[in-house]
């Protein structure tokens, strides 16, 4: 049996501080207004303000508390968001392993199986700026797909080409995967 290791897959987040400041400012403003309403209003308005606070906390938890990881021992890709059930897909049993664009400037590796669909964002050119997954992650994904689903060589060659491009310092917008955006 292969030695099992869990590899955390980092999220491809915006590098622009203004995006994070805007997000944080919005959350603080919503909580401040709802808190003021809870403190000063009565009846239904107070209940609604309390619900806004609760909904905001849940939404922030869903954005912040998410994890995607790869178990190299059994070739399984896992994804968990806040309190929702975990989704996992084994490379060998996946019905689909391919690239998927979201029509908003992001390209993800999508693995679909019986227990759900897991996506790993590989490339983005959107409001958050240009960014690509790192070469080490791209190569690990390619190696794991080759190990568990060797019939997917076309996809793994694309991942390796992207890894070489990123490692050479190439711009995400000019990368091999950029034509799929």
Task: Please provide the spans of the model-predicted regions.
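Acidic, Ser/Thr-rich low-complexity segments on the non-lumenal side of membrane proteins
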Residues: 86-124
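Generic recognition of long tandem-repeat/solenoid scaffolds
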Residues: 7, 12, 77-79, 109-111
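Conserved beta-hairpin
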Residues: 51-98
């Amino acid at each position: 049996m292969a030695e099992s290791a869990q590899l955390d897959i980092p999220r491809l987040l915006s590098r622009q501080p203004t995006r994070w400041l805007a997000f944080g400012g919005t959350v603080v403003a919503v909580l401040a207004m709802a808190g003021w309403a809870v403190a000063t209003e009565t009846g239904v308005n107070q209940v609604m303000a309390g619900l806004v606070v609760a909904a905001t906390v849940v939404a922030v938890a869903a954005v912040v508390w998410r994890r995607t990881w790869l178990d190299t021992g059994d070739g399984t890709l896992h994804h968990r968001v806040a309190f929702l059930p975990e989704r996992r897909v084994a490379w060998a049993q996946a019905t689909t392993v391919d690239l998927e664009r979201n029509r908003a400037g992001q390209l993800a590796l999508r693995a679909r199986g019986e227990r759900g669909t897991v996506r790993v964002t590989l490339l983005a050119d959107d409001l958050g700026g240009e960014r690509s997954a790192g070469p080490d992650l791209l190569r690990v994904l390619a190696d794991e797909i080759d190990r568990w689903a060797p019939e997917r060589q076309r996809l793994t060659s694309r991942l390796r080409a992207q890894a070489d491009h990123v490692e050479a310092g190439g711009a995400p917008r000019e990368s091999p995967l950029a034509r799929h955006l």
